[in-house]
Regions:
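Feature marks short, highly hydrophobic, charge-poor N-terminal signal-anchor/signal peptide-like helices
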Residues: 1-8
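Extended charged low-complexity segments that act as oligomerization/scaffolding linkers
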Residues: 190-198, 202-206, 214-230
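Extended, charge-enriched "interface" segments that sit outside catalytic cores
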Residues: 29-63, 234-284
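ATP-dependent phospho-/nucleotidyl transfer catalytic cores
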Residues: 31-134, 210
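Alpha-helical transmembrane segments
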Residues: 12-22
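Juxtamembrane/interface segments at transmembrane-helix termini
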Residues: 20-27, 200-204
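Nucleo/cytoplasmic regulatory scaffolds in medium-to-very-large eukaryotic proteins
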Residues: 20, 67, 74, 97, ...
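Active-site activation/catalytic loop segments of kinase-like enzymes and analogous catalytic loops
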Residues: 135-177, 184-201
Length: 284
């Protein structure tokens, strides 16, 4: 019965996937959310692992918790979009440029999802009792886990295989199968929100880089303080980009950055070259 339902829903899921791909396609391809991508066999094994470790709550299902979470995710994305409109960071972060170009699609998807939710139906969805997704529908956790560990891909064949592997230990209810198209839409908003968190971090580091270059104490002294605190390589990238933009020449800064990057087998020169090659690929 489960296999039949999955087959029936292929058409609906196909259209959701088309929207997903449109949302996640940039000049160089889709947005990559996580580094820890699982291969095909690992992904299916992980589905079985999830199934064995998920514990369902005895409480009645409630979609309100998920809807509040969806609203919060959208507000965060919206705030990031507005902040980017007046920030130069979009020039150095491909995901930021993508968000500016595609926000209208995200907004449209969010509004349609809110309109299409049948709260009475979604109350039938089993809720997880504990863990990161405690209080959320089980099918939502399953879909988010799939996207998180599959390079954010919603390929229909992988989706079906993942769900079938999950059901090796725990059978999904019919209501969960029927809910997949809308749950996918909500999960996509979750994934985009996570990307926005990375964009926000990059914006903060861009601002910090500007502060360092404008420091009244001098660039070298300001940078030395932050180097002791162990800044990320992203801060260095922003510094180099701003120096290039302003045609600034700070050999001491380059030397200090090189010294810090040496421990990870990277140099400022390599970073500049890598950025140049990336921009060349983007424009090609």
């Amino acid at each position: 019965m489960q296999t039949v339902l999955l087959s029936i829903y292929l058409i609906l899921i196909f259209f959701i996937i088309l929207l997903y791909r449109k949302l996640h396609r940039t000049k160089e391809g889709k947005i990559k959310i996580f580094e820890a991508r699982l291969n095909h066999d690992e992904l299916l094994s992980y589905a079985e692992h999830l199934s064995q470790n998920h514990t369902l709550s005895k409480k009645a299902g409630n979609i309100d918790h998920l809807m509040r979470h969806l609203d919060g995710n959208y507000r965060y994305i919206n705030a990031t979009y507005k902040a980017l409109s007046t920030s130069e960071v979009q020039r150095s972060v491909p995901a930021a440029e993508w968000l500016l170009d595609n926000f209208y699609l995200i907004e449209q998807q969010y509004k349609e999802t809110k309109q299409n939710i049948n709260r009475k139906f979604y109350r039938e969805l089993p809720i997880l009792d504990e863990g990161n997704f405690g209080g959320y529908p089980r099918i939502y956790a399953v879909i988010v886990e799939l996207l998180s560990h599959n390079d954010s891909s919603a390929d229909k064949n992988i989706l079906i295989e993942f769900l079938n592997s999950y059901q090796s230990y725990a059978t999904l209810k019919n209501a969960e199968i029927w809910a997949i198209p809308v749950i996918l839409e909500i999960a996509l908003i979750e994934i985009i929100r996570r990307q926005c968190e990375l964009i926000r971090e990059s914006m903060e580091e861009f601002g910090l880089a500007e502060e360092i270059l404008k420091s009244p104490d001098g660039v070298e002294e300001a940078l030395s303080k932050y180097i002791k605190e162990g800044p990320s390589t992203s801060l260095f990238e922003h510094l180099l980009m701003l120096m290039k933009r302003d045609n600034s020449d700070y050999p001491e800064v380059i030397s200090a950055i090189d010294e810090k990057l040496e421990s990870i087998n990277m140099t400022a020169e390599k970073m500049i070259r890598a950025e140049y090659l990336k921009q060349t690929d983007d424009n090609g």
